[in-house]
Amino acid sequence: MFKIGNFTLNSRLLLGTGKFDNEEIQTQAIAAAETEVLTFAVRRMNLYDKDLPNPLAKVDLSKFITFPNTAGAKTAKEAVRIAEIANHAGVCDMIKVEVIGDDETLLPDPLETYEACKVLLEKGYTVCPYISNDVVLAKRLEELGVHAIMPLASPIGTGRGINNPLNLRYIIERVNVPVIVDAGIGSPKDACHAMELGADGILLNTAISSAADPVKMAEAMNKGISAGRLSYEAGRIPVKYTAQASSPTEGIGFL
């Protein structure tokens, strides 16, 4: 169990809702993931026009914490406007601040992200910024007052896993708010690794929705995240450079 602002979460898997082939697979994958939090791009939801398609039409949103994001924003001003659209439509006031600074790599813009977070915090939102694995930026955002830090593992949709585990560990060790690893996770192994490093949770979309069997992958990710967290809490053995027998040698007679 952990908290983001006033929201208490039991599941450490936060699930994105895009890219599923159809609504049936989406619904089954959500169930298999056992998630409590569904995230979505506000621009995809058509919040004010009920005649347009709703990608979550078949999902009972009353059973979940809805977690809108500002995908599509390229400036702080755009991110704030998107967040306010979601809030005025009655969607959860916890917002993932996503401000993209480069169209090719889809890496977040640190300056615009910081400014958007500052404004949204002043307006009373629960703010969770998506950032690169910049340790100093993570600390500055925590000092600003954000409620969680969401560093990428690797660029969005690449499935490359954790490109820089050292920086991710530095972020986890240095901030005192939840760290949700977001973007680049490709397999349950990657998710488990992030959790073993001490992450509080994982936000996933492409790794599940684009898998050959999204429902099975959702289950696998759920178990990988649970295993990684349990391993972190248990404490792994230290890495050594010399062999050490697992059987004791004391008290063994000569043969």
Swiss-Prot record:
Catalytic machinery residues: 96 (schiff-base intermediate with dxp)
Annotated Gene Ontology cellular component terms: cytoplasm
Pfam families: ThiG
Subcellular location(s) of the protein: Cytoplasm
Enzyme Commission designation: 2.8.1.10
Main location class: cytoplasm
Disulfide feature: none
GO molecular-function terms, A-Z: thiazole synthase activity
Reactions it catalyzes: [ThiS sulfur-carrier protein]-C-terminal-Gly-aminoethanethioate + 2-iminoacetate + 1-deoxy-D-xylulose 5-phosphate = [ThiS sulfur-carrier protein]-C-terminal Gly-Gly + 2-[(2R,5Z)-2-carboxy-4-methylthiazol-5(2H)-ylidene]ethyl phosphate + 2 H2O + H(+)
Keywords: Cytoplasm, Plasmid, Schiff base, Thiamine biosynthesis, Transferase
Gene3D superfamilies the record matches: Aldolase class I
An annotated GO BP: thiamine diphosphate biosynthetic process
Residues given in the record as 1-deoxy-D-xylulose 5-phosphate binding sites: 157, 183-184, 205-206
Known pathway: Cofactor biosynthesis; thiamine diphosphate biosynthesis
Job description of the protein: Catalyzes the rearrangement of 1-deoxy-D-xylulose 5-phosphate (DXP) to produce the thiazole phosphate moiety of thiamine. Sulfur is provided by the thiocarboxylate moiety of the carrier protein ThiS. In vitro, sulfur can be provided by H(2)S.
Subunit structure: Homotetramer. Forms heterodimers with either ThiH or ThiS.
Family per similarity comment: Belongs to the ThiG family.
Name this polypeptide is given: Thiazole synthase
Organism annotation: Staphylococcus saprophyticus subsp. saprophyticus (strain ATCC 15305 / DSM 20229 / NCIMB 8711 / NCTC 7292 / S-41)
Gene field: thiG
